[in-house]
A protein has these predicted regions:
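NAD(P)H-binding glycine-rich loop region in Rossmannoid oxidoreductase-like domains
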Residues: 16-19, 25, 29-68, 72, ...
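Short-chain dehydrogenase/reductase
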Residues: 61-67, 103, 113-125, 145-148, ...
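Conserved Rossmann-fold NAD(P)-dependent oxidoreductase catalytic core, especially the SDR/UDP-sugar
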Residues: 68, 72-116
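Catalytic helix-loop patch of NAD(P)-dependent Rossmann-fold dehydrogenases
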Residues: 99-146, 167-169
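Substrate-positioning beta->alpha
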Residues: 123-124, 152-157, 171-193, 199-203
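Glycine-rich Rossmann NAD(P)(H)-binding loop
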Residues: 148, 170-175, 202-209, 220-223, ...
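Mid/C-terminal beta-alpha module of Rossmann-like enzyme folds, strongest
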Residues: 191-258, 291, 295-298
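Amphipathic terminal alpha-helices
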Residues: 273-281, 285-300
Length: 300
């Protein structure tokens, strides 16, 4: 909007309507299960960032929203005459349970991953690539570990687990990770509105690599959250996550397990990625550093 764009945003409630309007955008009441070309209207570019990102849920939830929802968004956007479709994805499309070390966009997707979030996002990417054409260009952006002020995913979890005493570092939090501050992702989206190759994927990252303990500890500390030092080895976390899933499914428990296979995996495997492609083809460079981002969180 600061650049003169008119922005519409998908909304599912009156509360979301108000939040979107307060930011100067126009709310459009729909969701991934009923979106049509009429909802897209005369928009020239679509930024698709809605997804089912929960650690736990009904078996079909990830497919319904991440695959079927993306397919509907693509169809609605193309029918409405949109020119560009920017799909916000994730490094999780690569996960099979392995470490990711010095990885770029040539690394193969994992459409048969054992983790529902990973395989559904990987297959959604495949849909986006196949939809690319001369008159409807699709671009994929892959952030890793999105963080920053206003976070509604990591910080509530850290607060709850610290308060309950459930928090434990897996393998001491020694796994190294790339990260993506929300401002850097927004900058990449702005660039992708006019730059980038159709059908291409781009990692969007902060400068540098840190251990999970360094990064999570710093984010928690910026909000006055103190995390305990307790640890559990990765193999034990993997077993605990798998066992919990079996028990929860077997007994139809409605609560979320304390640990899942996916959460055990992402907290113990390295995710060191390269963003040279985004820098070369999008002209991307981080607009905010990690230390500055943490300082802003402390001041918020």
């Amino acid at each position: 909007m600061a650049g003169g764009h008119q922005v519409r945003a998908m909304s599912r409630s009156e509360k979301s309507d108000a939040a979107i309007a307060a930011l100067g955008a126009a709310p459009v009441r729909c969701d991934l299960e009923d979106v049509t070309a009429a909802h897209v209207g005369d928009s020239e570019a679509i930024v698709h960032c809605a997804a089912f990102v929960e650690q736990w849920g009904p078996v079909d939830a990830w497919k319904r929203f991440n695959i079927d929802g993306t397919e509907r968004m693509l169809a609605a956007s193309r029918e409405a005459g949109a020119l560009r479709f920017i799909h916000i994805s994730t490094e999780s499309v690569l996960w099979r349970g392995q470490h990711l070390r010095d990885v770029d966009e040539t690394y193969p997707r994992a459409p048969n991953s054992p983790y529902p979030y990973s395989w559904t996002k990987a297959r959604a990417e495949e849909l986006v690539v196949r939809a690319n054409g001369a008159e409807f260009q699709t671009i994929i952006l892959r952030p890793r570990f999105i963080w920053g002020p206003g976070d509604t995913t990591l910080l509530p979890t850290l607060r709850a687990m610290a308060a309950s005493g459930q928090w434990m570092w897996i393998d001491g939090g020694r796994a190294r990770t790339s990260t993506t501050h929300i401002d850097n992702l927004i900058h990449a989206i702005e660039l992708a509105l006019t730059k980038g190759g159709g059908g291409e994927a781009y990692f969007v990252l902060d400068d540098g690599v840190r251990t999970l303990r360094e990064m999570i500890g710093a984010i928690a500390g910026s909000q006055g959250i103190s995390l305990p030092d307790r640890e559990i080895p990765a193999w034990a976390a993997d077993v605990a996550g798998a066992t919990a899933e079996i028990v929860w499914r077997l007994f139809g428990l409605r609560s979320e397990p304390p640990l899942t296979r996916f959460s055990a995996m992402i907290m113990s495997r390295e995710a060191v990625l390269r963003d040279g492609k985004a820098r070369a083809e999008l002209g991307y460079a981080p607009v905010i550093g990690v230390e500055e981002g943490l300082a802003r969180m402390r001041q918020a």
